[in-house]
UniProtKB/Swiss-Prot annotation:
<feature type="domain" description="PpiC 2">
    <location>
        <begin position="302"/>
        <end position="400"/>
    </location>
</feature>
<dbReference type="GO" id="GO:0051082">
    <property type="term" value="F:unfolded protein binding"/>
</dbReference>
<keyword id="KW-0697">Rotamase</keyword>
<dbReference type="Pfam" id="PF09312">
    <property type="entry name" value="SurA_N"/>
</dbReference>
<dbReference type="InterPro" id="IPR000297">
    <property type="entry name" value="PPIase_PpiC"/>
</dbReference>
<keyword id="KW-0677">Repeat</keyword>
<dbReference type="GO" id="GO:0030288">
    <property type="term" value="C:outer membrane-bounded periplasmic space"/>
</dbReference>
<dbReference type="InterPro" id="IPR046357">
    <property type="entry name" value="PPIase_dom_sf"/>
</dbReference>
<keyword id="KW-0143">Chaperone</keyword>
<dbReference type="Pfam" id="PF13616">
    <property type="entry name" value="Rotamase_3"/>
</dbReference>
<dbReference type="GO" id="GO:0043165">
    <property type="term" value="P:Gram-negative-bacterium-type cell outer membrane assembly"/>
</dbReference>
<dbReference type="InterPro" id="IPR027304">
    <property type="entry name" value="Trigger_fact/SurA_dom_sf"/>
</dbReference>
<dbReference type="GO" id="GO:0006457">
    <property type="term" value="P:protein folding"/>
</dbReference>
<dbReference type="GO" id="GO:0003755">
    <property type="term" value="F:peptidyl-prolyl cis-trans isomerase activity"/>
</dbReference>
<dbReference type="GO" id="GO:0042277">
    <property type="term" value="F:peptide binding"/>
</dbReference>
<comment type="function">
    <text>Chaperone involved in the correct folding and assembly of outer membrane proteins. Recognizes specific patterns of aromatic residues and the orientation of their side chains, which are found more frequently in integral outer membrane proteins. May act in both early periplasmic and late outer membrane-associated steps of protein maturation.</text>
</comment>
<keyword id="KW-0574">Periplasm</keyword>
Length: 452
């Protein structure tokens, strides 16, 4: 059942979008009367198109709700509105470019994507549509968003990703740099950090404001302020609640500028200058050093999962509903103390049935995306709900996980993917900036600057 297959990023984007759309009405209320006053006004002209206040209200509401769900600080309304409008401008420019280039997404492709998304959630398309509509998400809106995501994905593939190449020499250099010339003597580093977001493609005014904020925080940190409190109250990274503590990391897992800073710092010291990273500004404090575990400690690692499953195929006298229900019944019996392996040997239609459904240790990329995503969402010992893949319906149980140094080929694959992703992100940012510079954009509300 093992099969290498890349998971389309558009499916993940739509999965996140479905949750945001469901929350839109409640979030929009938080924007107050200002949004209502702008609802029918034009807030931006983008080439020969316009963005209305109503569209801006809806999108800003989604973003505000998403931040609330993540327990992240929500910017003031004017600031949020400006940031969201700039995002919408960039999106609109790309949609126009795609249409001008003749990129079209037919209904069959949209339906296929939605079907795959529904299957990844263990539902039929009708059930998935029903769930979204019950949450207040109009199906027509979700379908339209799916078409836009697919269009922009195809545009990026044509203009950027499809032109990225990674040579064997780059792969070899990457792996060598991960290990380092004296890997056995390398030290793992523990940092605290404060991250202030400022993507390179953000408006220049936003970048300058972010740098000013970061500079002020840096001065406080250098003056002896409690770094942990500063991080908790100001950092925009996911680890802000932990005081920005990154834990011990090998130098290879940290940005090069951060590693360079460590060479000049003693534990407890704050780096005297800001560190510019692609997404913003970093303030870092070296907490501690420790001896690494040797040459292999810095080598690319993979997380392997020991997993077993029960597969029921659809079609051979068994409908979709029957397969799901049978697996749901088996799951209930296993949760009540039944023997998973025994059920697998009796009912599974996979070649692993004779081993009690045991697939052994699975490395990333060795299963179909829907299976891997469900597997990755499980804790050790946990059993999934019935999951649909191209093979049928699965009941998945994770037995344990381990971290291992991959084979030479796996290390090469990891290196190639990391290099390609880094090059693609930079190329995309450059391409998007050029596209924006060649477009006509006029803002109709105050407090918004051009998205340089």
């Amino acid at each position: 059942m093992k099969k290498t297959l890349r998971f389309a990023a558009v499916v993940s984007s739509l999965a996140a979008a479905s949750a945001l759309l469901a929350a839109a009405p409640a979030a929009a209320q938080a924007l107050g009367s200002q949004g209502a006053q702008l609802a029918d006004e034009v807030v931006a002209v983008v080439n020969n198109d316009v963005i209305t206040g109503r569209e801006l209200d809806q999108r800003a509401g989604l973003i505000a709700r998403r931040l609330q769900q993540q327990n992240a600080p929500v910017p003031p309304t004017d600031q949020l509105r400006a940031q969201v409008l700039n995002q919408m401008v960039l999106e609109r420019i790309q949609v126009q470019k795609a249409k001008d280039d003749g990129i079209r997404i037919d209904d069959a492709t949209v339906q296929s994507t939605l079907q795959r998304l529904a299957q990844a959630n263990g539902m039929t398309l009708e059930q998935y549509r029903g769930r979204l509509e019950a949450q207040g998400v109009p199906w027509s809106v979700f379908t339209s968003d799916a078409r836009t995501e697919l269009m922009l994905s195809k545009l990026r593939e044509r203009e950027v990703d499809g032109k990225i190449t990674v040579s064997d020499a780059e792969v070899a250099n990457y792996i060598a740099s991960q290990r380092g010339p004296n890997a056995s003597q390398q030290q793992d580093l523990r940092f605290q950090h404060i991250f202030i977001k400022a993507p390179t493609n953000a408006p220049q005014a936003d970048i300058e404001a972010a740098q000013k904020k970061a500079d002020a925080l840096l001065q406080q940190a250098k003056s002896g302020a409690d770094f942990e409190k500063l991080a908790k109250n100001n950092s925009e990274a996911n680890d802000a609640k932990k005081g920005g503590d990154l834990g011990f990391k090998a130098p290879s897992a940290l940005p090069a500028d951060v590693v360079d800073a460590a060479s000049k710092l003693r534990p407890g010291q704050v780096n005297p200058t800001l560190i510019r990273v692609p997404d913003g500004f970093e303030i870092v404090r070296l907490v501690d050093r420790r001896q690494s575990q040797g040459a292999t400690a810095a080598a690319p690692k993979i997380v392997q999962t020991h997993v077993r499953h029960i597969l029921l195929r659809v079609g051979e006298g068994k409908s979709e509903g029957q397969a799901r229900q049978q697996l749901a019944d088996i799951r209930n019996q296993v949760e009540a103390g039944g023997d998973f392996a025994k059920f697998a040997r009796t009912y599974s239609q996979d070649g692993s049935a004779s081993q009690g459904g045991d697939l052994g240790w699975i490395s990333p990329g060795e299963t179909v995306p829907e299976f891997e995503r469900a597997m990755n969402n499980l804790q050790d010992g946990q059993i999934s709900q019935p999951i649909r893949t191209e093979y049928g319906y699965h009941l998945i149980q994770v037995l344990s996980r381990r971290e291992a140094e991959g084979s030479v080929q796996q290390q090469m694959d990891i290196a190639r993917q990391a290099i390609g992703q880094r090059k693609a992100e930079q190329a995309y940012a450059d391409w998007l900036r050029e596209l924006r510079d060649s477009s006509y954009v006029q803002y109709k509300i105050g407090g918004v600057g051009p998205a340089n």
